[in-house]
């Protein structure tokens, strides 16, 4: 029985979305146990499950605008910190939160702790492609700076994830660069390229450009945290802007446009669901001793349930354990 | 009378699109003269204008897959190199090409030459926002690496451009970063932030995130060439993927969806035209002694004409001359 510690107080719709997501997941999976950290009375308002679930009460919580490292240090009894400590103490196998991302990164780093020989855990998400398979990208912003060796470790971690959690055999690894030729990029990219090309255990397919990401050009895309963050936010911002404009065009387009939209409803819905990658779960801070997963602050119960499913798969396939074994071989850098 | 040198042989639809764009521009503007470089017989097939236009014949051209610097050095009689040389010799005031971007950057850098005290010219484009005003971003990839001082110069250049060419008073300058707080980012961002904040001649509004770019959060956005290239390609790739998926959903959605799309036609067209920023012209390699402008390889006559309009505005407002004056004050770095 795998145990997942849930920060029930983080996110825009806490605790309702978290607790209802927990209800769903407990129905769907008989082999998990959930521990909910937060305000017991409020949690009980929404909790319908009665087996394999427990509540650890606390009044304290971390807010979305708290300074991350300070919050972790000062709010020792917050729902997020208690959830992370449960993993540290061996009382839970993984943490899920929809709260303050920076604080969760800090909690993961300082409380759960890094895998030996991994200097800089990276933030990994599965992002959508037009054909639906998706791709895993990291680092999406856990770090503001990375070395070539970090990126090399991300290629390994991303490959483990794509293979274990998404079932992709010999995942194709691409290095995000400003052109596809092997000579492209700044010194960081050139050095990373050499490291990736030299390791035959990786299925390295060379440089990939941001324009091709949604076309499924690679299964795993590695980049530094600064660029990854900018690319992720560009994709999100563009998708939101276009969908918003489409809606505006329809609403401002008179009766004809509205009738057209009504007839197109199913097609538009299908488009939206293809672009919506919340089914793939949340963002994993990968490189820690246990899964620490952030789901969107705006997550609803369904997304929370998907994220619990993702964590369950990570635990069942022991992707973290495999990483520990692999990186223990590395000489300390 | 301003003279614009046009590489008539570069781009997917050369020379037709270039020559037809020239025809249109000559009709629209009575105060410009165009010099077309390329295959005279082919150019004449499409040339309808007879005044203020001349052809300089050459058989040589640079291909899209030529190695840029080598091509510039070896193909001395190519249409692109001859156009750049005409500017260098004072026979033309600006260059336009739809050909090999890298080669045009090299031609700009080595033939047209940099403005004194500008180390690294940057690639600037006007990109779309949902409200239609757009924003200017640089560097979009002329450089793989930049220093804080380069980014500071881009803020000045971008401000000149937005004010002169787009008529925006005291343009708001944002620094692309991985968060809006002033303490965010890697050392490059932190150092750039200090430089921008210390210069009261700039209307610096602080850090901006990639997610907000299309919402018009700033008029000028500065970043290093690697990140700018990744962000530009992410925006383009996402927009193309979504529009492609929308089309696919409609085509695969049966009669109902097709009828809906027919009724929505005007709204979808309006959406497309809002996202299409070819009206704003091409990408300017800014920081050179004359306007060197790249229009998309796939540009049609209308886009070529828009780019000629853009160059005409740059020449009439003397945005390059203003930059020369401004940067001549700087101590050599």
Swiss-Prot record, chains A, B:
Highest taxon in the source lineage: Bacteria
InterPro entries the UniProt entry points to: FA_synthesis, Phospholipid_synth_PlsX-like
Annotated organism of origin: Streptococcus gordonii (strain Challis / ATCC 35105 / BCRC 15272 / CH1 / DL1 / V288)
One BP annotation, GO: fatty acid biosynthetic process
Keyword terms: Cytoplasm, Lipid biosynthesis, Lipid metabolism, Phospholipid biosynthesis, Phospholipid metabolism, Transferase
Membrane is among the record's keywords: no
Family, as annotated: Belongs to the PlsX family.
Protein name per UniProt: Phosphate acyltransferase
Role played: Catalyzes the reversible formation of acyl-phosphate (acyl-PO(4)) from acyl-[acyl-carrier-protein] (acyl-ACP). This enzyme utilizes acyl-ACP as fatty acyl donor, but not acyl-CoA.
The keyword Lipid metabolism belongs to this UniProt entry's keyword annotation: yes
EC number of the protein: 2.3.1.274
Catalysis: reaction(s): a fatty acyl-[ACP] + phosphate = an acyl phosphate + holo-[ACP]
NCBIfam families the record matches: plsX (TIGR00182)
CC terms in the record's Gene Ontology section: cytoplasm
Any one GO molecular-function label of the UniProt entry: phosphate:acyl-[acyl carrier protein] acyltransferase activity
Compartment(s): Cytoplasm
Subunit structure: Homodimer. Probably interacts with PlsY.
């Amino acid at each position: 029985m795998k145990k997942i510690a849930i920060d029930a107080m983080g996110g825009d719709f806490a605790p309702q979305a978290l607790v209802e997501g927990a209800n769903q997941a407990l129905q769907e999976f008989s082999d998990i146990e959930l521990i909910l950290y937060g305000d017991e009375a409020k949690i009980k308002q929404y909790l319908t499950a009665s087996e394999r679930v427990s509540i650890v009460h606390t009044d304290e919580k971390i807010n979305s605008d708290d300074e991350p490292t300070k919050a972790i240090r000062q709010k020792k009894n917050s729902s997020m910190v208690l959830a992370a400590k449960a993993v540290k103490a061996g009382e839970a196998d993984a943490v899920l939160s929809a709260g303050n991302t920076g604080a969760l990164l800090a909690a993961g780093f300082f409380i759960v702790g890094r895998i030996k020989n991994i200097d800089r855990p990276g933030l990994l998400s599965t992002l959508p492609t037009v054909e639906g398979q998706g791709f895993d990208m990291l680092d999406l912003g856990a770090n503001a700076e990375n070395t070539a060796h970090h990126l090399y470790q991300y290629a390994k971690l991303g490959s483990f994830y794509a293979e274990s959690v998404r079932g992709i055999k010999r995942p194709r690894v691409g290095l995000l660069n400003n052109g596809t030729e092997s000579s492209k990029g700044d010194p960081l990219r050139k050095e990373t390229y050499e490291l990736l090309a030299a390791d035959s255990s990786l299925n390295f397919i060379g440089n990939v450009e941001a324009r091709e990401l949604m076309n499924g050009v690679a299964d795993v895309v590695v980049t530094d945290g600064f660029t990854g963050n900018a690319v992720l936010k560009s994709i999100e911002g563009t998708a939101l802007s276009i969908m918003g404009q489409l809606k505006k065009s329809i609403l401002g387009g008179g009766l004809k446009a509205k009738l057209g939209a009504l007839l197109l409803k199913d097609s538009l819905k299908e488009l939206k669901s293809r672009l919506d990658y919340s089914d793939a779960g949340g963002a994993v801070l990968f490189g820690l001793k246990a899964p620490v997963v952030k789901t969107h602050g705006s997550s609803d119960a369904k997304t929370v349930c998907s994220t619990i499913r993702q964590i369950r798969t990570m635990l069942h396939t022991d992707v973290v354990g495999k990483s520990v074994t692999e990186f223990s071989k590395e000489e300390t850098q």
